[in-house]
Amino acid sequence: MLKLHGFSVSNYYNMVKLALLEKG
């Protein structure tokens, strides 16, 4: 459960990072 939660958070973090990069 903790592993899955961690993966979910990591995936969300990556999405936010991508959005910021695209935003410039």
From Swiss-Prot:
<dbReference type="GO" id="GO:0005737">
    <property type="term" value="C:cytoplasm"/>
</dbReference>
<keyword id="KW-0963">Cytoplasm</keyword>
<comment type="subunit">
    <text>Monomer and homodimer.</text>
</comment>
<comment type="similarity">
    <text>Belongs to the GST superfamily.</text>
</comment>
<comment type="function">
    <text>Conjugation of reduced glutathione to a wide number of exogenous and endogenous hydrophobic electrophiles.</text>
</comment>
<protein>
    <recommendedName>
        <fullName>Glutathione S-transferase</fullName>
        <ecNumber>2.5.1.18</ecNumber>
    </recommendedName>
</protein>
<dbReference type="GO" id="GO:0004364">
    <property type="term" value="F:glutathione transferase activity"/>
</dbReference>
<keyword id="KW-0808">Transferase</keyword>
